[in-house]
């Protein structure tokens, strides 16, 4: 399985000023549960925004043109994928998500209610017709958060 794991505002925003503009422990716990023991692939700015580096109990991979001490780095997602076994999560940012849309099997999306505006906002890429939208459900009994899955349309597989 290769999946995109993302939290998105109603405006489609995934970040602002190189950070996530909301904090929900239910979403963070879910992120940890889904990614522990798996490979996570991210861009350099996502890596730099992490409060703990590397994220423990996961194989951390950063896509960057330069090397970063303490983490595996590759110049492309394709180069990284050649070294991966098992489940893989693409965890951001926007450029990684854009490229991962052609490589992933699922999009696992948390819908946050927070309205975000202003400058320096980062948006999730457009989800095209190759993806089939699933139902929107409440996330883990959390009153504010919703969850939605997208899978590749059988027509396009």
Feature-to-residue mapping (PLM):
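Enzymes that bind and transform nitrogen-containing heteroaromatic metabolites
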Residues: 1-155
